[in-house]
């Protein structure tokens, strides 16, 4: 239609492409990203809530074999009897505990009649210059511990382990990476000690049950994806209305003069 021909101008075509790209990103990237974070947070909150109301269970019921992992039982309290490997410890660096930097101290624990599992003993604060402070020794005798089951973390890309102050140091608690460093085969999940446990250090608390803003952000991106093409349509309609008003307000074109009018205009009218 001629009245819509202006939409084929470069400016309108560029605007339409921007709106289409923005809408596509809203529905396929931005909204799913926030909704996925909301689903993860809701799942973790549910696991924490369940763990607070459930008594500890033997570790071997959730990790029966050496290659076992239990992502559906994260934060669940478990008990295990066995021995630490005191000469094989690794530090997780650049951890934030109560708003301050900390090291988390990791050590393998051999469960009697069960798997060898990585144990997060807790945290210690770094000395000046991010150096490792003196770390209390582990017990060498058989002990029984109570801890929370945790999922192995993904390794940090581009951040390789290194040795400093006599300790292997890593940037995440990835059981596969720690197993490769120590040469000790570890289960897929690890343990985080609760308070007053043998070999424990600074206690790592349970996260607050906060759903976060992710659901509202996801809904907002969906709304933006809906409103963007509506806005484009509104501006196109407004342009059409403006052109109609401009056309209606312009004076009608002059009618062509007849031969008599031309002669009269040139020689004058007869009296």
UniProtKB/Swiss-Prot annotation:
Compositionally biased region (Basic and acidic residues): 262-271
Membrane topology: Multi-pass membrane protein
Keyword Metal-binding set for record: no
Transmembrane portions of the chain: 11-33, 172-194, 214-236
Cellular localization per UniProt: Cell membrane
InterPro entries attached to this UniProt entry: Surf1/Shy1 (IPR002994), Surf1/Surf4 (IPR045214)
Region Disordered: start-end pairs: 245-271
Main localization (coarse): membrane
Cellular component GO terms held in the UniProt record: peptidoglycan-based cell wall; plasma membrane
GO terms, biological process: biological process involved in interaction with host
Pfam families named among the record's database cross-references: SURF1
CDD domains: SURF1
Keyword Membrane applies: yes
Key words of the record: Cell membrane, Membrane, Transmembrane, Transmembrane helix
UniProt-listed PANTHER family: SURFEIT LOCUS PROTEIN, SURFEIT LOCUS PROTEIN 1
Family: Belongs to the SURF1 family.
Name this polypeptide is given: Uncharacterized SURF1-like protein Rv2235
